[in-house]
Amino acid sequence: MRAFVVTGPCEAGVQDVADPQPRPGQVVVDVARVGVCGTDVEFYKGDMAYLHNGSAQYPLRLGHEWCGTVGSVGEGVDSWWLGRRVTGDTMLGCGHCHRCTSGRQHVCADRYEIGVRHGWPGALAERLPVPVTALHELPDSIDDTAGALIEPGGNALRAALASGAEPGRRVLVWGSGTIGLLAVQFAVAQGADVDVVGHHEETLAMARSFGARRATLSDEGIEGIYDSVIDATNNSSVPADALALVEPGGRVVYIGLASEPSLIDTRLMVLADVTAVGILSASPAMQGVIEYFASGRVDPRPLVAATVPLAETAAILAGRRPSDAGPGPKMLIDPHAG
């Protein structure tokens, strides 16, 4: 089969690799769509921290935001799964430690991460092996475009829930990339009064169309104070700035990751009785996202700028956008095209 393989910093291409065979407890999925995210870009450029702490090494097969159809099943897997449209969890815990047995496999110390950690091959390929325990079935009301956005949606839904979004609550989402815009949609769906700050007028316009009250360019400054602030940026200065914008007794939700450490004056947090929450992984919220997407309460598809063939993946990771791309921040790959 064909797979996209990164062999070194900014060195990558499509290769012919062996077809995966399902091991006991696994299925092999025929991949329909794959989302490209910032983690993939960091791996492609050689900046990802996992490359420097031993959690990942080249060659790499990327892709952890995906959907597809189960094409084969391994020993011990119910044949009911054959032909089912699915997406799946990125985080594959050991299944035995106290974190896994308490439902926190996404922070298992020995976890694999599909297309990210400890060599589990990613979805930027025609087929993908996945443990059946990681699968989530997709209803017909969720098409392939939306299906590839379940995983980032899980991160965003967790952020919105952690913010306490509800009618009358003032929520600021800082960042208008994929996660930020999805967080806007979920917070609005939960009834919150949502403002957004970001770098690009095109994505801020999308935020307004999703129901944000105000959407402001970051260089214009931020006015007001909020019950909750969601940091969905990769800017190391934003965590401290977010703390300065939250109401005493409020909440700050950190879901963005900067490439260098960020610093917060915890004295301000204590004296204002602020709760800070960190969000890692979509795992606990993926089924909830499926329900939101299936019902139409949240529609992620406007976020997709374009869908391109597998052969164009390297160009997308290098920052190229097709001339006919829409205004959204998300690029999708069709592994069977091109």
Predicted feature descriptions by range:
Residues 1, 240, 283, 287-338:
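C-terminal hydrophobic helical "lid"/dimerization subdomain
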Residues 20-34, 49-98, 139-141:
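Glycine-rich beta-strand-centered segment in the early N-terminal region that forms part
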Residues 23, 81-82, 166, 247, ...:
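Residue-level recognition of short, solvent-exposed, well-ordered loop/turn junctions
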Residues 64, 94-174:
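NAD(P)H dinucleotide-binding glycine-rich loop of Rossmann-like/cofactor-binding domains
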Residues 140-219:
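Mid-domain Rossmann-like dinucleotide-binding core that forms the NAD(H)/NADP(H) cofactor-binding site
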Residues 163, 195, 201, 205-275:
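Glycine-rich cofactor phosphate-binding loops and adjacent beta1-alpha1 units
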Residues 255-259, 279-282, 308:
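Short strand-turn motif at the edge of the Rossmann-like AdoMet-binding core
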